[in-house]
Amino acid sequence: MMTKQRPRSPGRPKQTSDETSTYDVILGTASRLFMENGYEPVSLQHIAKLCNVTKASIYYHFTSKPELFKIAVTTMLQRGYEQTQICLMKSGTLTEGLLLIAEAKIARPHAEMETILREAETFLSKEQIEEIRDGERAIHQLLADHFEKEIQSGVIRQKNPLLLAQAFSALLMLGNREDITSKYASARELAEELVEIFWQGAGS
């Protein structure tokens, strides 16, 4: 399961609403900094300063920087899974769902996940890395399940649905390139072209 319980030392009093808010502020700030800058350039001191809390406060909620990174990334991936599911479920066709996913991702560009993880792996435990990979796999499997339905109905040629899911995700990373996004008037316009390119290869 991707949803993790917030760490609390044995015997520590139950969190108040203020403490919960502090947890969320730290987690949100850390998530943004990690995705913008990668793992190593981000310090707990910098996070504490931006959150207007002490470094000790961060350690109260998170045992270490690697654990904070892991929770930040898995929380983001869980949110991405939920948003992907919403886009796919509320759309009349898979094409419409992919377009919504692409538009949302392009509108909120961030560093390429694989690059960030490669840099952070040195500092993370095998268990932390596996939890993050599980989050990635869940999103790919969700997409793959929908591609499989289209394959079974004949909309898509017989292909590996998981490979299609990973290929689609990789294609969307082009939305992070300023030399590409600058040539389009909106995230929607670029999303439409990327989805069209994807379907040219995947469609029947």
Model-predicted regions and their roles:
Residues 1-21:
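N-terminal intrinsically disordered/low-complexity leader segments
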Residues 22-25, 29, 33-67, 71:
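Helix-turn-helix
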Residues 27, 73, 77, 129-140:
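Amphipathic, non-transmembrane alpha-helical scaffold segments
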Residues 29-33, 108, 171:
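Short amphipathic alpha-helical elements of helix-turn-helix/winged-helix folds
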Residues 36-40, 91, 112, 153-154:
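Short coil/turn segments at alpha/beta junctions that flank glycine-rich nucleotide-binding fingerprints
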Residues 71, 75, 82-111, 164-168:
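Hydrophobic alpha-helical connector segments
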Residues 84-87, 103-109, 117-124, 197-201:
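Helix-loop "lid/cap" segments that line or gate small-molecule binding pockets
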Residues 116-122, 129, 133, 137, ...:
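Hydrophobic/aromatic-rich alpha-helical bundle segments in the mid-to-C-terminal region
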